[in-house]
Amino acid sequence: MDAALVTVGDELLAGDTENTNATWLARELTERGVAVKRVLTVPDVEGAIADAVREYADRYDAVVVTGGLGGTPDDLTMDAVAAAFDRSLEENDLARADLERTLKAITDSYPDLNVDIEAEASIPAGARPLINDAGLSPGAVVENVYVFPGIPGEMQRMFEGVADEFAGDVDSRVLYTSEPEANLIERLDAVRNRFGVLVGCYPDRAAGHNRLKLRSEDPGKLDEATAWLREEVRLVDPDADTQVGEAVGEDDSG
């Protein structure tokens, strides 16, 4: 499964809010074997959101959209997703019932809360509603597009409710080495060409090591590539910061 992430919000583009949703979702999807191919942040502009959703829905197996749900003027995501699929917004009975239950439960704490329930409970026609157990605004699933709130706690709770719908065949292995990145280039090219796996090197200067991540849809090739690197690269244990392997050709006899 291939996926794209679309995060919505002027505050993200301005740097006022850290885009933790993209990082969290990318990690969760990758752990499920999903290949995240694109991460895009768009402003609170209906046309920009609709264009991104339309393009990615055609190109990828799944699209996850976060942010822009609610009752404020800049909350345009549901309108944009509906437009991307040439649908209207319709009040959803399940979403309305959940909103009414939630509002009843919090009315004593927020007596002046004024919510347009019909607008809040409206999702693209024919969409599947996603109930918000941690907040107000419902999400929705429209064909292969999943729409979640932008508040991290609400987004994570909603994602967990549909997490089983995301599954892929991409597996990964991670190794750590104290060797300089520049010294690894030839061996990383070799393992990529020999075994047909994807490999990346990610420096962690604070820890004093490099993280090597191998990815493939073929578990056998991945195991072979990992075993080859274990023989060719000096590895370390990132927790103990001790060497766990020797590079071929090194003489440790004293």
Where are the regions a protein language model picked out?
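Glycine-rich beta-strand-to-loop/alpha-helix junction loops that act as flexible
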Residues: 8-10, 65-73, 150, 217
